[in-house]
């Protein structure tokens, strides 16, 4: 670290990492001594998570993590996967929706579903949330949500660039309050992560595809 002061993002990352190690250990070990140590690590992680601003109190968070412990391979804790779709049309416009939960605008996105490929999830999310049919063209980005600070849940975000192929605008009644096509000079507000993804998105819409964005390894890769 470059400062003696620990940031909330660092505390959150360390907490989630410790919790993942401890829950994975509990999922694989039946040795009582080891299990007790893993549970103690979970207590430390819950203290850190609460200090980072979690809504639950220490005991509730620890209990929630304990209830999520699986056995064997299903118990190996990994980041969740979110799949998004930046969709462009022939008029150079970008498909955006206003999220029902926050009122913010963003491209269609959702959790990866079992039984679907990542590209299929992108097509499915676009259809369900906006009524538009699309075809995936390329992967724009694969990034760590915690590292970029746009989530408090450990996740990898995979964002596809897609071209609209049909359908008509229709907002999902539970997930979106509005949907629409927008040019770069007429974007709605508030828009999530404007500077982070919008320039790359419109470059793709206009045909200037770039290499997939990803988080370069830190040096050292871990831990601080």
Regions found by a protein language model. Give the residues of each.
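Acidic, metal-coordinating catalytic segment for phosphate/diphosphate chemistry
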Residues: 35, 39-84
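Nudix hydrolase/Nudix homology domain
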Residues: 2-38, 44, 104, 174-224
């Amino acid at each position: 670290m470059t400062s003696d002061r620990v940031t909330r993002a660092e505390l959150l990352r360390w907490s989630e990492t410790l919790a993942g190690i401890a829950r994975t250990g509990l999922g694989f070990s039946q040795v009582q001594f080891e299990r007790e140590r893993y549970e103690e690590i979970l207590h430390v992680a819950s203290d850190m998570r609460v200090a980072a601003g979690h809504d639950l109190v220490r005991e509730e968070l620890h209990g929630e993590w304990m209830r999520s412990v699986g056995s064997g391979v299903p118990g190996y804790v990994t980041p969740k996967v979110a799949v998004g779709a930046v969709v462009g049309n022939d008029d150079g416009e970008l498909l955006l929706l206003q999220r029902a939960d926050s009122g913010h605008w963003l491209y269609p996105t959702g959790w990866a579903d079992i039984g679907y490929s990542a590209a299929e999830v992108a097509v499915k999310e676009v259809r369900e949330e906006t009524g538009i049919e699309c075809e995936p063209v390329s992967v724009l980005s694969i990034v760590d949500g915690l590292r970029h600070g746009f989530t408090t849940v450990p996740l990898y975000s995979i964002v596809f660039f897609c071209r609209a192929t049909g359908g008509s605008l229709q907002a999902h009644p539970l997930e979106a309050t509005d949907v629409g096509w927008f040019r770069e000079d007429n974007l709605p507000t508030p828009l999530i992560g404007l500077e982070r993804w919008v320039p790359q998105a419109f470059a793709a819409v206009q045909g200037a595809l770039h290499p997939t964005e990803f988080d370069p390894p830190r040096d050292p890769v871990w831990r601080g």
